[in-house]
């Protein structure tokens, strides 16, 4: 029986002054263990989602944890039948998740971590302001009951949204969440710096919550967007029914794919009347490459660009 592929989302805020020198040995460790996916490293830490065999993932985690600075690196796992990534990359970054505000450092100041088992009680408190720190296309797939959607298109927009809508003197308790924990952890550091006193964030993010909290007790509604070719996962962490439009990158549902405006790899109901001719031509060419690669039983030569550049778990 074929063993399922293990998908591991991992991150840790930790000072890595030698991060530039870490790139090549980390990349070699990924190659040696047969790992696909992308890891981002910066002076503030490491972040990314990777996939491989059980032995391969364990080997990579052992390599990382051999460094005393990463012995407690956070990671969440799920499984799939097909390889969700086509390439193996380690990228050097200024930030492992881009907020774009100087001085925000979760290594120095961070909110209160909340375990998944305690999350329901916290967000049931009427005095708690619950904010989804993810982008609009992610929130549209699923979110927690009662969560505020900032309707941001990138994490860089989050600080301005907070300044325009909330006041530390009025909003005394704030709880935030994201896919794997990294965005809300950095957001908590930012909000503490802005004067918010009680700031909480979901430890391990939505993925850890779905893993640990039974469906009969859940306050989660819908699927969870993930940054790989699965597009979404259900509450049991199995692959969801969404695809993703290669032209506009929006997740598309079963209903969307039944629309007359949906053309696989080229357009969807969300973008069919707004695409530039250049984007449309590019999508058509990319789809031809994908179909040719599939016919030859080869990985897509340029990969699916599933907004992975952000890798914002």
UniProtKB/Swiss-Prot annotation:
Domain of life, per lineage: Bacteria
Matches recorded under CDD domains: RHOD_YceA
Domain Rhodanese residue range list: 124-218
Catalytic activity: uridine(34) in tRNA + AH2 + O2 = 5-hydroxyuridine(34) in tRNA + A + H2O
Ion transport recorded as keyword: no
EC number(s) reported in the record: 1.14.-.-
PROSITE patterns: RHODANESE_3 (PS50206)
EC supergroup of this enzyme: oxidoreductase
Name of a matching Pfam family: UPF0176_N
Stored NCBIfam families: PRK00142.1-4
Cross-referenced PANTHER family: RHODANESE-LIKE DOMAIN-CONTAINING PROTEIN 7-RELATED, THIOSULFATE SULFURTRANSFERASE/RHODANESE-LIKE DOMAIN-CONTAINING PROTEIN 2
Cited HAMAP family: TrhO
Protein name: tRNA uridine(34) hydroxylase
Organism of provenance: Pseudomonas fluorescens (strain Pf0-1)
Gene responsible for this protein: trhO
